[in-house]
Amino acid sequence: QGAEYEETRDAGLTKLEEALKYVEETGVDCLAVAVGTSHGVYKGEPHLEFELLDHLSKEVPVPLVLHGGSGTGDENLAKAVRTGIQKVNLNTDVSEAGKQALREALASTEVHGSGKDEFTPKKMNLQQTIAAGVAGFQAELEHYMKLFGSENRW
């Protein structure tokens, strides 16, 4: 977990032999690899093992997944994708963006929407509240899609 990152990071790094054996024995269609990220909020600075990731991506015959991508930084994440990661999990970053967008909408005094859909934060209904949070999620996801070169791709 992120809180113990500095103490536990190296012990759990993926070993090529174990990864190959696991993929062969289980028949999984993708593999989450440990290359220096951690779930949750980091205590300390994340240090990804790009050499290990490069080696794994060349040898492991299934797409690689990066868990704990939140808080890793755009530069590290973009490099991880260029080095072989094909799926990045970013729940904390996306959730926080949604919560922050909702906080901002509720604290705002602006009129939102237009015509019959016009509302102020004090008169937001449930759907409008949800929409404010979803807008934050969407903006964060769009950021990552552009960062990873996934924009306008299916």
Where in the sequence are the language-model features?
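Short, surface-exposed acidic/glycine-rich loop or hinge patches that mediate macromolecular interfaces
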Residues: 70-71, 93
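Alpha/beta enzyme core
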Residues: 1-62, 74-83, 90, 97, ...
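C-terminal alpha-helical cap/extension of soluble enzyme domains
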Residues: 76-154
